[in-house]
C-alpha cells in the first residue's frame, strides 16, 4: 500500500460542516469529532509546550469541535494535560464541552487513595484537584476512568450525584466498563433515584471490535452515548503508514511500533483500494464508518498539530457512504 497523498483541509467547510449529536439520553450536544487531549504536555510532541497546546485548542474551537476529552492522569506528568488546558481555555471555556476522568493511579498527586479510587472520599479529592488544574468551576462530563473493584458502584454513583447537586459536575460517564458492569450501574442508579451515566468510553476501531460483543449492545439498550477511544488505532487509519513503516515522530512509531508491524496489511491494502476507487482518503472512510455505528456519538481523535485537527474536523464531511458501503468496510475487517 502506498502512502496517501496529503489532501489539504477544506477550511471553508469548518463550522458549517460539523455535525452535532445528543450524548446519550441527555440534553448535552457534542460535535461528532472530538479532541482527545492525552497528548497535551506529552514529551516529544508539539503539544508538550503551552504554546503548542494553545494552537491545537484554538484550531479545534475554530473548527467547530466542542467535545474536549482529557483525564487527570494525562500528560508527561500526572495532571499536566489538565493544567495545559486550564491555561489555554480562558474566556473560551464556555465554547466547549469539557470532559475529564478520574480513577487511575495518580502516584500520590491527589493524595493517599489506598487504591479505592471510586470511593466517596477519593472522588471529592479528585474533582477538586481537576477543577483547580482546569481553572474552571464545573466539569461538563466527569467520567470514571476504569472500574474500582474495591468500592461498591452504589457509593461511586452517590458521590457523583452529590457533585451534580453542587453544580461542580453537569453529567457523568464511565470508561472501560464491561457490558455487565454497564447494566449493573444502570440498575443501581435507577434503584437509588440517582442521575444515570450518559456515556461510555471503550476502545473501538476497525481493528479492535471487541466492544461489539457486549459493550455496544449494553450501550444501545440503555441509551448511552458511545465515545470510542483509539478510533484511528493510534493513527494507523490516517493513511500515513504502510508495510515499511510511517512517520518517525508519530505516536505509533515512537511508542507502539508493534501496532504497525503486526497490522493485517493485506486487509489494509484492500481497504486502501476501496478508498482509492471512491477518490476518498482512508481518514474520511474511517470516520464515516465509525459515525455510522449505532449509538456512536463522537469520534475522539488526538492531535498534536493544528493541521491534524483541521483534517479530522472536515473528514466526516468528505464522504456520504451508502449502507452497502458501510457493510463492505465492516466485512473487510470482520474479526
What is each stretch, according to the model?
Residues 47-60, 118-135, 182-187:
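Short, acidic/polar
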Residues 59, 63, 133-134, 167, ...:
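Structural motif
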Residues 9-13, 153-334:
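Beta/alpha (TIM)-barrel catalytic core signal, keyed to glycine-rich beta->alpha loops juxtaposed to Asp/Glu
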Residues 44-47, 73-80, 148-152, 179-180, ...:
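Acidic-and-aromatic substrate-binding clefts and catalytic sites of carbohydrate-active enzymes
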Residues 38-40, 71-73, 101-105, 144-147, ...:
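Active-site beta-loop-alpha junctions enriched in small/polar residues
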Residues 38-51, 109-124, 145-151:
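Active-site mouth loops of central-metabolism enzymes
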Residues 2-96:
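N-terminal binding-site loop/beta-alpha segment at the start of enzyme catalytic domains
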Residues 131-151:
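Active-site groove signature of glycoside hydrolases
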